[in-house]
């Protein structure tokens, strides 16, 4: 299942916000959507309301329109009119075949199974503020659930061969499609020096889950809080994952408790959980994140990933697509922090200035300054600021700031407002 569009309905926080998850080039929904923005703009609220819709769409009153697809068939729920008695008319449609499936008075049993969103086994993972390392009992329970998943694979293997005596499989072939193979592959790809190798028995004949670090077997009690976090949040996904691996996943702040290097890899970790045997992602993953490292990785995959920035504009929440490609020839943390979080930095300013020099063959600062001044978007009243360095005079604010950064001892200061003004001009030049 994949979400395509949402139109909210006078929500307390989100108002009448509209979200579109479609790739305009293909007309298909993005496989991955990442929400970003300051605290309080509704990232987690969007995920929570989506979960409510997936559970009981007829009992949700936050939306005017939701469009989704299941196995390439597009369905929609739409609230059309308010009746005199205060009730709402609901239109449930098969958009692909232009058929009205149900109108008004919806109850769960009324839905055609193939179009019912709460038959799709979506998975929702909230962020955790508590440290699993401080609650060993909780993590012990997670490990027991991991053992159960391993046993489930074994039972399914035996059941398959009993049910299909004429086409029995070797364990190695069956394991390729199993949940624990999925986990092992994603886990081992994530960690450089740590591996999961399966379930075994200790000297007391008790079942144990096997991990190695730097080639040495380690007990689960010695795992770090970040390592435990990866396992803890992965287990519910494995438990609810269906055979087709096409569960819709809603994940709030997957980077919690993780080092920045791991934050950069967690995006791929969740994608890896839902790859088929040919390496193709089968589901849609919708995340909310504050991590520059995760977002840098997300922005590097514009073919299947959409980044949406939610922002408060005079009390109204608006959605802004972070479009691709970026202004630079490659993605940098400085650009991510500006485009996604609205944080201007001298580093990003100079990256843009250097990009202009390289792209337009203006290697000398003076030549670049003249090029900027001659650009149609340049306005001397806004973008002009005369400065000198040695015997050379520069006329643009961008060159002034560039020289102030590179020659910090020249006594030239600049404000954040000037920094943003110069950044916006250079973005227009590079657009």
Model feature map: region roles:
Residues 58-66:
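Short beta-strand-centered segment that lines the nucleotide-binding/catalytic pocket of NTP-utilizing
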Residues 1-57, 204-331:
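Switch/communication elements of ASCE P-loop NTPase nucleotide-binding domains
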Residues 2-5, 13-15, 20-25, 271-280, ...:
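RecA-like P-loop NTPase motor core
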Residues 61, 197-198, 347, 412:
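Short, flexible/disordered secondary-structure transition segments
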Residues 72-74, 78, 82-191, 337-344, ...:
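Coupling/switch segment of ABC-type P-loop NTPase heads
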Residues 4, 9, 20-22, 69-71, ...:
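A structural detector for beta-sheet-dominated domains
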Residues 2, 7-11, 22-24, 131, ...:
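Extended helical coiled-coil dimerization/tether regions that scaffold
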């Amino acid at each position: 299942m994949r979400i395509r569009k949402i139109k909210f309905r006078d929500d307390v926080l989100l108002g009448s916000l509209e979200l579109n998850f479609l790739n305009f080039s293909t007309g298909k929904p993005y496989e991955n959507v990442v929400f970003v923005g300051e605290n309080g703009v509704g990232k987690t609220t969007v995920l929570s309301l989506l979960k409510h819709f997936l559970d009981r769409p007829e009992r949700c009153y936050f939306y005017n329109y939701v469009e989704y697809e299941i196995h390439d068939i597009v369905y929609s729920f739409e609230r059309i009119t308010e009746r005199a008695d205060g009730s709402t008319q609901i239109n449930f449609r098969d958009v692909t075949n232009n058929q009205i499936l149900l109108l008004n008075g919806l109850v769960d049993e009324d839905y055609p199974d193939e179009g019912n969103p709460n038959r799709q086994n979506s998975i929702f993972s909230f962020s955790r503020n508590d440290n699993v390392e401080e609650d060993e009992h909780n993590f012990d329970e997670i490990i027991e659930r991991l053992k159960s998943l391993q046993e489930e694979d074994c039972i399914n293997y035996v059941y398959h061969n009993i049910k299909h005596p004429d086409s029995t499989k070797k364990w190695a072939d069956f394991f390729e499609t199993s949940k624990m193979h999925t986990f092992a592959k994603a886990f081992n790809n994530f960690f450089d020096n740590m591996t999961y190798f399966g379930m075994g028995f200790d000297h007391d004949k008790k079942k144990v889950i096997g991990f190695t670090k730097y080639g040495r077997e380690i007990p689960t009690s010695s795992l770090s809080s970040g390592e435990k976090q990866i396992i803890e949040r992965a287990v519910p996904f494995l438990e609810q994952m269906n055979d087709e691996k096409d569960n819709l996943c809603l994940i709030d702040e997957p980077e919690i408790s993780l080092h920045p290097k791991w934050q950069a890899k967690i995006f791929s970790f969740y994608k890896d959980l839902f790859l088929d045997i040919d390496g193709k992602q089968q589901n849609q993953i919708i995340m909310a994140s504050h991590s520059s490292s995760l977002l840098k990785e997300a922005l590097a995959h514009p073919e299947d990933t959409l980044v949406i920035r939610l922002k408060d504009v005079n009390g109204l929440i608006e959605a802004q697509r972070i479009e691709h490609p970026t202004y630079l020839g490659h993605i940098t943390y400085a650009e991510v922090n500006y485009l996604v979080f609205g944080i201007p930095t001298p580093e990003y300013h100079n990256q843009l200035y250097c990009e202009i020099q390289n792209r337009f063959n203006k290697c000398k600062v003076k030549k670049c300054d003249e090029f900027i001044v001659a650009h149609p978007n340049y306005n001397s009243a806004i973008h002009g600021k005369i400065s000198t360095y040695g015997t050379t005079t520069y006329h643009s604010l961008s060159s002034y700031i560039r020289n102030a950064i590179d020659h910090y001892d020249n006594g030239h200061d600049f404000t954040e407002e000037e920094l943003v003004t110069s950044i916006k001009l250079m973005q227009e030049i590079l657009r």
